[in-house]
C-alpha cells in the first residue's frame, strides 16, 4: 500500500532554477499580475515558467469560495482593476506567447461573476496579439444571468471549466458549487458558439470510485465537451482535504483508455496533468484531431 505521507517517485518534480524561469517570474511581478501557478502551488511551475508559459489569474487574488482542494486565498475579494486587461495583453506580447491561458478566482460578489472582465481581456489580447490563441478557464458563474452569453460572444479559442471531482464529493470538496450547473455551463457555451473547443478536468485521489469517474466522462460527453484532463490531487496544506490515494501511472493510462472510447477529441490523464499544463501543444493536437475527425465524416 502506498504511504500517503510520502509522495511517490512519479509525483516528484525538480526545483525550478533556470534563467527563463526567473525571467518569467520577474515579468509577472513587474506587470503586477497574479498567476494560478503561484497561488495554487502548481507542481509544474518550474517546467512551465522555464518555457515562458504562465497561466494568468485575473479578477484579483482572493476567491469568494472556499473549495477544500484549492490553495488560493479566500475572503473579501479585491477591487476590480480596470487596467488588468491591458497589462495582461502586454505580458502576452513580451512573452511572445502563441497560446495564452487565462483563469480567475470566483467572484460571486460581481453581478456577472467577472464574465465581462474575461471578455475585455480577450479583446485586449486580440487587438495587440491577433495571432495568439486564447484559452480561458473560468469559474461556474453560478446564478449569474447573462454571463454565458458574454463569454460565448467573446469567442475564446478554448473554453475550459473544470468539474473538479465526482458529484458525490461536491458537498465536502466543492461545497459552493453545483455539479449540474457546471455541466450546463459547458453545454451552453458549446450550444451558443459551436466553434469554441470546450474542455473540462477533474482530480482523482480524493476517495472517488472508478465507476463515478466513468460516469463523469459520460456526463461531459453528453455536454459535448471536447477535451478531458485528469490529474492527481495533491494536498496544498494540512488544512485542505486529505489525499485518499495516489493513483498510479498505470491506473491513469487505464482511465485514459476508457475516456478515449467515449468520443473525446482529446484526453490527457497523468499524475501531473493540470488544466493548463502544455496547453499550447495540446491546443495544436486538439485542432489536428478535430480536422482528422472532420475529414472522416
From Swiss-Prot:
Residues 49-265 form the Radical SAM core domain. One of its GO terms (molecular function) is metal ion binding. It is an enzyme of class 2 (transferase). Pathway: Protein modification; protein lipoylation via endogenous pathway; protein N(6)-(lipoyl)lysine from octanoyl-[acyl-carrier-protein]: step 2/2. [4Fe-4S] cluster 1 binds at residues 37, 42, 48, 276. It catalyses: [[Fe-S] cluster scaffold protein carrying a second [4Fe-4S](2+) cluster] + N(6)-octanoyl-L-lysyl-[protein] + 2 oxidized [2Fe-2S]-[ferredoxin] + 2 S-adenosyl-L-methionine + 4 H(+) = [[Fe-S] cluster scaffold protein] + N(6)-[(R)-dihydrolipoyl]-L-lysyl-[protein] + 4 Fe(3+) + 2 hydrogen sulfide + 2 5'-deoxyadenosine + 2 L-methionine + 2 reduced [2Fe-2S]-[ferredoxin]. It comes from the Bacteria. Its cofactor is [4Fe-4S] cluster. Keywords: 4Fe-4S, Cytoplasm, Iron, Iron-sulfur, Metal-binding, S-adenosyl-L-methionine, Transferase. Its EC number is 2.8.1.8. It is found in: Cytoplasm. The keyword Nucleus does not apply. GO terms for cellular component: cytoplasm. Binds 2 [4Fe-4S] clusters per subunit. One cluster is coordinated with 3 cysteines and an exchangeable S-adenosyl-L-methionine. Belongs to the radical SAM superfamily. Lipoyl synthase family. This is Lipoyl synthase. It comes from Rickettsia prowazekii (strain Madrid E).
